Amino acid sequence: MDRFPRSDSIVQPRAGLQTYMAQVYGWMTVGLLLTAFVAWYAANSAAVMELLFTNRVFLIGLIIAQLALVIVLSAMIQKLSAGVTTMLFMLYSALTGLTLSSIFIVYTAASIASTFVVTAGMFGAMSLYGYTTKRDLSGFGNMLFMALIGIVLASLVNFWLKSEALMWAVTYIGVIVFVGLTAYDTQKLKNMGEQIDTRDTSNLRKYSILGALTLYLDFINLFLMLLRIFGNRR
């Protein structure tokens, strides 16, 4: 007699969650690899670097396009097909690579690599915490979101003020915020994954990519904040 009967209603949601989270991290990794490749390739292209550094309209257009893609993916996910969702995420990752290519001009390759490793370690630890903790992190959501808005506004103000003190304050606060968001977003995605029907492969793909985009943004922003702190300028 089986003393510990296994109920399908228990086993299937757990298996579905694991499938969903595996795809989230998988697509996030694909996005990061594409971003890294495009950034490296663009940094080694004199034509692309000249375009980025001399054509302000192109750079502003690039940033607007990135914001538009995030809004479309977040707001219209239910209306998009799995194929279009995948294409838009890949496009966003590539455009981010173009935007970030300048870091190879500003910082040494060794410091970029070491900062990436540090970021991966911090991200992994906090994502693991968010996934495994029994503590409900939803209460931190509003606080982290308000802090994020504060960081964005302070960064915009400092674009004109050029205050080094404000820049460092934003940087260190930003590290704390994105570390917290990593744990918060991971738990939120875990809760979402428990509700997803993995038999609907199209829906699974779309929401896996949406989750990947969320964690991708946390990782990229944490990396940029840490690079300001640990990066060695050329």
UniProtKB/Swiss-Prot annotation:
**A molecular function (GO) term:** calcium channel activity
Cited PANTHER family: BAX INHIBITOR-RELATED (PTHR23291), PROTEIN LIFEGUARD 4 (PTHR23291:SF50)
Taxonomically, the superkingdom here is Bacteria
What is the membrane topology listed in the Swiss-Prot or TrEMBL record? Multi-pass membrane protein
Protein location: Cell inner membrane
The UniProt entry, under InterPro entries, shows: Bax_inhibitor_1-related (IPR006214)
A GO cellular-component term linked to this record: plasma membrane
Q: Which residues form a coiled coil?
A: none
Where, in residue ranges, is this chain on the Periplasmic side? 1-23, 78-79, 124-136, 185-206
UniProt keywords (A-Z) are:
Cell inner membrane, Cell membrane, Membrane, Transmembrane, Transmembrane helix
Topology, Cytoplasmic side: 45-56, 101-102, 158-163, 228-234
Report if keyword Cell membrane is assigned. Answer: yes
User: Lineage, please?
Assistant: Bacteria, Pseudomonadati, Pseudomonadota, Gammaproteobacteria, Enterobacterales
Q: Which GO terms describe its biological process?
A: regulation of proteolysis
Q: What is this protein called?
A: Inner membrane protein YbhL
Native species: Escherichia coli (strain K12)
The record lists the membrane-crossing segments as 24-44, 57-77, 80-100, 103-123, 137-157, 164-184, 207-227
The family note in this entry says: Belongs to the BI1 family.
